Amino acid sequence: MSSIQDNEAPNVITETRFRTLMQSGYLAEVYCQSSAFNKSAVWYGVWVIRIIDEDRTFMKLLVPARSMSDKHDEIRIREFKTANGLISFLASMGCTHANVPLQEGGVSTHSLP
Protein backbone atom coordinates (compact mmCIF):
# COMPACT_ATOMS: atom_id res chain seq x y z
CA MET A 1 0.00 0.00 0.00
CA SER A 2 1.07 3.55 -0.61
CA SER A 3 1.47 5.71 2.46
CA ILE A 4 0.99 9.41 3.00
CA GLN A 5 2.79 11.40 5.67
CA ASP A 6 0.95 13.62 8.18
CA ASN A 7 1.98 16.80 6.39
CA GLU A 8 0.08 15.54 3.33
CA ALA A 9 -3.08 14.62 5.26
CA PRO A 10 -5.12 17.49 3.78
CA ASN A 11 -4.96 15.60 0.46
CA VAL A 12 -6.90 12.61 1.82
CA ILE A 13 -10.48 11.96 2.86
CA THR A 14 -12.24 9.34 4.98
CA GLU A 15 -15.21 7.29 3.77
CA THR A 16 -17.72 9.28 5.85
CA ARG A 17 -16.65 12.63 4.41
CA PHE A 18 -16.37 11.04 0.95
CA ARG A 19 -20.03 9.99 1.13
CA THR A 20 -21.09 13.50 2.22
CA LEU A 21 -19.24 15.14 -0.67
CA MET A 22 -20.68 12.65 -3.19
CA GLN A 23 -24.16 13.58 -1.97
CA SER A 24 -23.23 17.25 -2.44
CA GLY A 25 -22.40 16.77 -6.13
CA TYR A 26 -18.71 15.87 -6.08
CA LEU A 27 -17.45 13.07 -8.34
CA ALA A 28 -15.68 9.80 -7.56
CA GLU A 29 -12.70 9.23 -9.84
CA VAL A 30 -11.43 5.64 -10.07
CA TYR A 31 -7.78 5.22 -11.10
CA CYS A 32 -6.30 1.86 -12.12
CA GLN A 33 -2.82 1.55 -10.58
CA SER A 34 -2.14 -1.96 -11.87
CA SER A 35 -3.68 -3.58 -14.95
CA ALA A 36 -6.48 -6.00 -14.14
CA PHE A 37 -6.42 -9.70 -14.89
CA ASN A 38 -9.12 -12.35 -14.78
CA LYS A 39 -8.67 -15.46 -12.65
CA SER A 40 -11.53 -17.90 -11.97
CA ALA A 41 -14.18 -15.38 -13.05
CA VAL A 42 -12.82 -12.66 -10.71
CA TRP A 43 -11.05 -9.52 -11.94
CA TYR A 44 -7.97 -8.61 -9.88
CA GLY A 45 -5.97 -5.39 -10.04
CA VAL A 46 -5.27 -2.32 -7.93
CA TRP A 47 -7.64 0.64 -7.97
CA VAL A 48 -7.72 3.81 -5.86
CA ILE A 49 -10.47 6.40 -5.66
CA ARG A 50 -10.33 10.12 -5.18
CA ILE A 51 -13.08 12.68 -4.75
CA ILE A 52 -12.98 15.58 -7.22
CA ASP A 53 -15.08 18.59 -8.13
CA GLU A 54 -16.26 19.17 -11.71
CA ASP A 55 -13.36 21.46 -12.66
CA ARG A 56 -10.82 19.17 -10.95
CA THR A 57 -9.42 21.87 -8.68
CA PHE A 58 -10.38 19.87 -5.56
CA MET A 59 -8.91 16.36 -5.26
CA LYS A 60 -8.55 14.07 -2.24
CA LEU A 61 -7.59 10.38 -2.08
CA LEU A 62 -9.81 7.97 -0.16
CA VAL A 63 -8.24 6.47 2.97
CA PRO A 64 -9.66 3.80 5.28
CA ALA A 65 -8.63 5.41 8.60
CA ARG A 66 -5.65 6.50 10.60
CA SER A 67 -3.56 3.73 12.08
CA MET A 68 -0.45 3.57 14.18
CA SER A 69 2.55 2.10 12.37
CA ASP A 70 5.74 1.78 14.39
CA LYS A 71 6.32 5.19 15.99
CA HIS A 72 4.70 7.24 13.24
CA ASP A 73 1.07 8.17 12.82
CA GLU A 74 0.58 7.12 9.21
CA ILE A 75 -2.30 7.29 6.77
CA ARG A 76 -2.69 4.63 4.07
CA ILE A 77 -4.53 5.04 0.79
CA ARG A 78 -7.48 2.69 0.39
CA GLU A 79 -6.74 0.24 -2.40
CA PHE A 80 -9.29 -2.05 -3.99
CA LYS A 81 -7.81 -5.40 -5.10
CA THR A 82 -10.86 -6.79 -6.96
CA ALA A 83 -13.37 -5.24 -9.33
CA ASN A 84 -16.11 -6.74 -7.13
CA GLY A 85 -14.81 -4.87 -4.07
CA LEU A 86 -14.62 -1.64 -6.06
CA ILE A 87 -18.14 -2.05 -7.45
CA SER A 88 -19.50 -2.88 -3.99
CA PHE A 89 -17.94 0.29 -2.59
CA LEU A 90 -19.36 2.47 -5.39
CA ALA A 91 -22.81 0.91 -4.89
CA SER A 92 -22.61 1.60 -1.14
CA MET A 93 -21.91 5.27 -1.97
CA GLY A 94 -25.12 5.39 -4.02
CA CYS A 95 -23.75 4.98 -7.54
CA THR A 96 -26.17 3.26 -9.92
CA HIS A 97 -23.47 2.14 -12.36
CA ALA A 98 -19.78 1.28 -12.26
CA ASN A 99 -17.23 1.77 -15.02
CA VAL A 100 -14.04 -0.05 -14.04
CA PRO A 101 -10.83 0.85 -15.93
CA LEU A 102 -8.90 -2.36 -16.63
CA GLN A 103 -5.60 -0.97 -17.94
CA GLU A 104 -2.95 0.67 -15.75
CA GLY A 105 -3.41 4.44 -15.86
CA GLY A 106 -7.07 4.17 -16.84
CA VAL A 107 -9.54 6.54 -15.19
CA SER A 108 -13.32 6.59 -14.87
CA THR A 109 -15.59 9.12 -13.19
CA HIS A 110 -18.78 8.37 -11.25
CA SER A 111 -21.55 10.64 -10.00
CA LEU A 112 -24.74 10.11 -8.09
CA PRO A 113 -28.03 10.22 -10.02
Regions from the PLM with identified roles:
Residues S2-S3, S24, S34-S35, S40, ...:
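Generic serine detector
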